[in-house]
């Protein structure tokens, strides 16, 4: 479904001030409804194989050009800090990344409230041990196009020695689906200033591009530091992938124990 077809009216075009051709589609595109997809997580056994995989994947990565035409299929690629290191990125460039990215989620468990049952020692493998070097994500608006894109990605891995696939996780949703807790997906997607489209009804004012894309001013009016050299960071972004076990019963019990009426439970849940 293109954004212009979504409930709430047609999307109005606006000025483009970011380099859409150099930004991955997944940074700006809304997931279509319905959507189908797969995350593939892999490890580089040696730098040469990792670089060869990136060379093979590069022609298949979609840019954010005309991202508002969201009803299609796109492929994106992300590299972890350990992945950049495994590729042989120079040490001075690696040190130019923020500490939070260099350390990874497991090392920042306290800041992320990952304790008790959420402690990294309980995480499903391969999460939290630094083995994930690359993530390849496929999104599509139809099962046939999803399968075709997935087959194209798997073909790039081919018989490439030196790259090990650690996990392939399928995902998706239909237009009326809600998550395990009863919430509707995609309601928190912000509009980004300079991306080429005005906000949809209810989105509020556009957020400065620098809050999401490196190389542009953020809400404070300054451009945040980027990795060195500039080509390594400009028009990129930071992303996280986490796999949760939804404890719906515990969540509903918390609502009942802390709210007296159904209306209060709804407010607390919101």
Identify the residue ranges that each predicted region occupies:
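Long, low-complexity, Ser/Thr/Gly/Pro-rich intrinsically disordered segments that act as flexible linkers
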Residues: 1-270
């Amino acid at each position: 479904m293109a954004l212009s077809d979504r409930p709430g009216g047609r999307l109005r075009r606006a000025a483009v001030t970011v380099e859409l051709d150099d930004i991955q589609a997944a940074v700006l595109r809304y997931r279509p409804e319905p959507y189908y997809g797969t995350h593939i997580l892999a490890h580089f056994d040696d730098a040469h194989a990792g670089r060869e995989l990136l060379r093979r994947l590069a022609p298949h990565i979609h840019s954010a050009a005309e991202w508002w035409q969201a009803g299609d299929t796109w492929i994106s690629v992300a590299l972890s800090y350990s992945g950049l290191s495994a590729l042989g990125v120079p040490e001075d460039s690696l040190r130019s990344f923020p500490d939070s990215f260099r350390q990874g989620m497991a090392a920042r468990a306290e800041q992320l409230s990952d304790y008790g049952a959420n402690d990294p020692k309980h995480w499903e493998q391969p999460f939290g041990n630094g083995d994930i070097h690359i993530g390849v994500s496929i999104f599509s608006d139809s099962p046939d196009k999803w399968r075709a894109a997935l087959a194209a990605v798997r073909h790039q891995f081919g018989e490439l020695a030196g790259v090990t696939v650690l996990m392939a996780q399928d995902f998706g949703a239909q237009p009326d689906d809600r998550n395990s807790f009863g919430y509707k997906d995609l309601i928190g997607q912000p509009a980004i200033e300079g991306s080429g489209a005005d906000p949809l009804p209810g989105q509020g004012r556009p957020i400065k591009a620098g809050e999401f894309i490196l190389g542009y001013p953020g809400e404070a009016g300054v451009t945040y530091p980027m990795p060195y050299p500039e080509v390594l960071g400009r028009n990129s972004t930071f992303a996280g992938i986490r796999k949760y076990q939804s404890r719906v019963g515990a969540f509903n019990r918390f609502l009942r124990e802390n709210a007296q009426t159904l209306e209060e439970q709804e407010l607390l849940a919101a």
